Amino acid sequence: VETEPEVFYARETDETKILYVGDPQIGASKGQPQNGEALTEEAGAANTAARNDGFAWNRTLETAFAQTPDINFVISAGDQVNNTGKPKEEEYAAYLFPKALKTVPVATTIGNHDSLNADYAYHFYNPNPTDNGLTEAGGDYYYSYGDGLFIVLNTNNYNVAEHAETIQEAVASDPSATWRVVTIHQDIYGSGLDHSDTDGMILRTQLTPVFDSYDIDVVLQGHDHTYSRTKMLYGDGQVHSGYEFRLNEDGSDYDWDHAYNVASGESIPLAPEEGDEAGAAALAAFQADNNCYTIENTTGNTVVDPQGILYMTANSASGSKYYELIGTQQDYVANRSQNWLPSYSIITMTDSRFQIDTYQILNDGTTEKIDDTFTIIKTK
């Protein structure tokens, strides 16, 4: 069988356009209503969910590329697929189906749903791979494009010393890059109900000072299936405990119900049972310790030569699954939304400007912005 030739675009880099997406998570709609019926039966449900989510994922990509035809490459903040720890080829087939992914590079991040199976590594050949941050799916990597140095960390591995080694190696490879951008899956500064105040921020106390020390400009995140943009943040300069998750007894997944203090080994219940006063106190102490940031005093949607770091969290680009926003917006959040619609961001990067515009796709296929344009300007 002879296939049609594909066209691959190598675009100009004086102004780089990046499509930034979160959590396509192909297959996650299984068990959720589809045309009035829930896909709860094991037989056939996974394939149907993969088909439906793949269709929606393709629609998002086609919409983004029609709106911005000169996209240089795509950044996915993780959870390409849904089926944690199991073979998931039907989900990867649907993820990779869109024609747009055959025309530009795609920089994927290992999410918690990708992490515990080697399938991810069979599909993505990442540049400058390291032996840091390894799980079954792979580890940290980095690359340069245009005026940016991009560092991708597998934060499903909680060894922050290894992630710091990756950042050090990456910065040494391109020390003059104007922009230093990190992509991680878990949103250490997010605003979703399911993750932002529990497992999402598990590495916040450890990664915040590391990002500060290497002058990172922007951190792109996923995981929480909501949209948020922070104020400009930097560490508070204090010493905080480190935290991690550990695998469950059979090693099939992480114990998401407990965080562990790295130094003491203390187990912290993230959802204490009613009446568990000790557990509630441990959780409160964990959350208080994660107030390890300082909010920079800036105004408006354009900042010039900021000291702090911008943290973005992308909502699901396919719409396969959404979460609620946390009840009380955190003080570090500048804007957030959950409109139960697929969304994506277009990043425009030059040697002096880093601009983010975020859109959602309405049911009729048109788009509208869900946040003001946010711009970082560098003059030095």
Predicted regions and their residues:
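Core catalytic region of metal-dependent phosphoesterases/phosphodiesterases
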Residues: 54-116
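C-terminal or late-domain output modules
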Residues: 59, 63, 67, 102, ...
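Short acidic, glycine-rich surface-loop motifs adjacent to enzyme active sites
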Residues: 77-81, 174-194
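Acidic/histidine-rich helix-loop elements
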Residues: 20-59, 125-133, 190-197, 322-337
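Solvent-exposed loop/turn segments at secondary-structure junctions
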Residues: 24-28, 80-84, 112-116, 147-150, ...
